[in-house]
Each structure stands twice: as C-alpha cells, then as structure tokens.
Amino acid sequence: MEDDAPVIYGLEFQARALAAQTAETDAIRFLVGTQSLRYDNQIHVIDFDDENNIINKNILLHHAGEIWQISASPADRNVLATCYNKISDSKVLTCAAVWRIPKELQGGNHESPDDTSSNAQALELLCHLDNTAHGNMACVTWEPLGDGKKLLSLADNYLMIWDLQESSTKSVLSSSVTLEGKGQLRFTSGKWSPHHNCTQVATANDTAIRGWDIRSMRQIYCIENAHGQLVRDLDFNPNKQYYLASCGDDCKVKFWDTRNIHEPVKTLEEHSHWVWSVRYNHSHDQLVLTGSSDSRVILSNMVSISSEPFGHLVDDEDLSDQEDNLQEEKTKEPLQDSVIATYEEHEDSVYAVEWSSADPWLFASLSYDGRLVINRVPRALKYNILL
C-alpha cells in the first residue's frame, strides 16, 4: 500500500508560526508567519489541493513585525490573531493583535501572482490587545468552541481574558490574574481546554504546568517540575476531558491526568533535542504529533491512553459470527502504544506541527528555515483505525 509522498513548500524568510485555519472545515488550509528583521513580514495562506497533491498560496503582508505565533479564530475563517515583535524606544516588545484577511482573498482561490510578493495585500487590523501595562506577550489563544469573541493571552506573569466587541474592532480586558511566587515568573505557553464548558485553561511557566478556572481566575492544579527543563507546549486531548500532553527542553513528551498530577500517565523519549510542539489529532486522539529541534517530526499511536484503548468497537448486532470472534479477540486487551513514523524532511529545528482542520489524516510541520512540509498518516494505520 503505497503512501503519498510529502509535499514541501519553501518560504523565502525564516519562520516559526503555523496554524490550521480552524473555522475552515472544507478546504485544507494552513497559515504560516515569517520572522524577518530586515523586510516586511508575511503570512502565507497555504491551500493544499489533495486530489492533485499541489499547493496554492496567497501572501499577506504583516507590517507590524516578526511573527512569533498565529492563532486562527474558531468561528470566522478570515480572522486571526498574531503575537509579534516590534521595536519601541530601542527596546523589543512582543505585542498581540487581531487581523482580518482582505475580502478579495477570503475564498482562498486567488493565487498570488508571483513569488516576489510585490503585489501582496496587507492584513486588515481589527484591534490590538493592549499589553503596555503587562509586559511581553507570550501567546494568544481563542476560546475553542466559542463565537470568536473571547481570547486568552499570556504576557510575562499575567493571564488575561479579552472580549472582542464592535465586530472585533475593540478589545476589552474582562479579567486577569497574576502569577505570583519567588523570582521572575514568566508564562511560556498556554492552552484553553475544550471541556468543562471552556472554563479551564492550562499554562506553562519554567518547568511547571498550572490549571486555572477562568470563572474565579484561581489556580486549580499545579504540576511542579512537570519537565526537567522548560515546558514548551501543551495540548488537551479533545475526547478525554482530564488528559493533557506537554513537551519540553528535556526532550520528553508527557501525558497527564489532571485529577492525579503526581506522575505522568505516560512519557515518550523519542526526540534527541528540545521538543517545541505537541498536538493531539482532533478526531482520533490516539494520534499524537511532536516536532523538535532535532529536525524530526514524530507521529505516535498512544492508543492505550486514548478514548478508544481497545480500538474501534462495533455494535454486536452489526456482526456476523465470524466477525464476532474477531471482535472478541480485539476486545481482550488494550492495543500497544508505538511510534508510527518519523518524518525527516526538515533540515532545521521544527518549531510547529498542526493537524488539518478539514482532513483528520493530514498534517503540516514548519522548520525555522522556512520549510513547510505536508504529510499524511500512513494508509495502513488509517484503515486499521477505521475498520
């Protein structure tokens, strides 16, 4: 069973920001943000034509500065937020803003005329998330199942919830909490849980992971020394409400049950350098992607701690006698966790991996040299999960 070859797209600038266009569930579309100190930065809107295995792109100018993170609105496919650096009074500030893709490019079907981006249009600014009193922005993330009017941002040691008003042209700080403790505490990443009516978020600072209830803005759990070194990224299992994945500079990926935080449920040690990104598949949570500065992307099958530890079970009424026997064998014991594939198309640090929001079997990875690689889950595993 021949697997499709990876599709590679090169940007002319260095890049570390990648997001799937969350609200787009028909077209396979990714957003990539560049990091250039000398030139105008860009967001490349990447459309992947699955049938012909080709990439179409649109380039949008992001005049505000080099892009450190992109987060796509869950409700409006044409709205996104970025964290970016700007120079002010010879100091570097990391800021955040909400943008709209210009109307002419909203369908995603008008390819940019050339690679020079000389005719590229600029993103339309909707509003800034004003962090002048709170320090440098570390990340911005949208309320997962919301109407695209609520955002979480982390800046230094502040956790802030924002409401967007007046067609998203105005941001209002609705609540905030300060991380307090010894030394200079600083958030590095955060994730909004899709469970519990979206009332919980998880944050990372140094080697610790903390859970917060955003109704009371109080800490609800803290995993001290979750990793031996800095925690880089977090992701919630979309189908198991208490399960959380983390990765860090200790080269490890850990899986946690937030009801019992004394030790991880599972630990992966497949990477040989810092792990920057971890992502659960939105539909099949046993599939977990990780990207690392060892320049590799690893796809793991974490079936034993997934929502279907015994595989895909079928109702008894739908089975013949022969199938019944097979099904009995299948249900006797949980399936084994394993590394499915290691992807080595990158030659530089892989800072981001993302699953497509339109096709659960397809994902993208981005390395610092501006190389975007689109890959698929191996067919054999896909059919094994489905059948």
From Swiss-Prot:
Residues 312-333 are annotated as: Disordered. It is found in: Golgi apparatus, trans-Golgi network. Belongs to the WD repeat EIPR1 family. Keywords: Golgi apparatus, Repeat, WD repeat. Transmembrane segments: none annotated. GO terms for biological process: endocytic recycling. May act as a component of endosomal retrieval machinery that is involved in protein transport from early endosomes to either recycling endosomes or the trans-Golgi network. WD repeats lie at residues 132-172, 182-222, 226-266, 270-310, 345-385. Residues 315-326 have a biased composition (Acidic residues). This is EARP-interacting protein homolog. GO terms for cellular component: Golgi apparatus. It comes from the Eukaryota. InterPro entries: EIPR1 (IPR040323), WD40/YVTN_repeat-like_dom_sf (IPR015943), WD40_repeat_CS (IPR019775), WD40_rpt (IPR001680). It holds the Pfam family Beta-prop_EIPR1.
